[in-house]
Amino acid sequence: MSNARYWLWFVMAFRPGNERIWEMVIPFQDVKKAYDAVHEGNHASMNAKEKKSAVTTHIEQCDSIIKYCEDKGYRIITFEDENYPPLLRNIYNPPAVLFCMGNMENFISRPAVACVGTRKPSVYSAEITEKICGELAKREIAVVSGFALGLDSAAHKGVLKQNGCTAAVLACGLDVNYPKENEKAKKMIAVNGVVITEYLPGTRPDRWCFHVRNRIISGMCFGTLVTEADEKSGSLITAAHAAEQGRTVFCIPPGDIFDKRYSGVIKYLRDGAVPVFSHLDILYEYYTSDYFRNNDISMKWPELYGENDIPYRDSRTVKRKNQSSRIKPQEEQEITKQGTQMAYEHLLDDMTDEQRLVAACLKDGDLHSDEIALATDIDSFQAVSYTHLRAHETEADL
């Protein structure tokens, strides 16, 4: 917390979400040294506007904000903080400072998936969003969304019904009542989850705030689920960030392929997004992914930012680099096996007794339907309908 005032100074002087903050801080590898070099406006790379902002922003203003947050019960988490969301460090232009209300420790202790969509959804999309997010919450997956009306609210609601962990990422200050219809939900979310923003207290929502904010929603998660969006939906900005960050994009197949409300989803499905028919599709993707294998991203300046790139512009490259240096082939095989087993166990949770019997028969290899019927006392025609379970397991082994 000792460096919080200097991180805050950069945010106040150059505004939240400005990548110039990193261009000034990274060369020093220390935010205090960067502040000492920049605050008088003498840094060589600064333009006239930046110099004026630097000399008119005073460190005492930062101390006042810290005191205000303490009085309101808000936490200030900087990029250096151990409670900074790990995956968020691994994106281009991560937020230098997060203002939080709630239980960040609980959030960072589990995997997270983002869920976004339109503010004016169909009944179909609202129901399926709430259902899937609730099922993920029951399985200790955190759900991140943007706290807007419509499908964002449905995502949060589904998690809250299960007393799960959800994160609401705001496009305004924590103390700003927006949207006013969701004010009570803030306190409910903060019990097991967290309300987050990179914007200073008192900041009103503006159009550009939402666009800048969306990179945080996707950046905190291993994947982003889009449940309903037309071609102009703002939720597609979040999906685009997810793709650029090397994260998985999930989409709910449209309830009506001719309905223009789903045109944005259809585009992403055509481009290779993972179709989601239930929460199991998301769980399977996580437990067989690189994030399950290597989800420990610690705070290390040299590894996090290359000498010629501030910060990462392609997290997919980063993942490959980390895997090649940290995971040996034998270890990777063992981790994949472990992830497959966990995905298999989650599948069992949602099976009937007969399906579990068939799954047990298929776990060690393929069997003819007649052999399954003989071993389980299940009709062979019924057994055939269950043999798709082996396909899930085989795919995970590849």
Residue ranges with predicted function:
Residues 1-135:
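Short, positively charged patches
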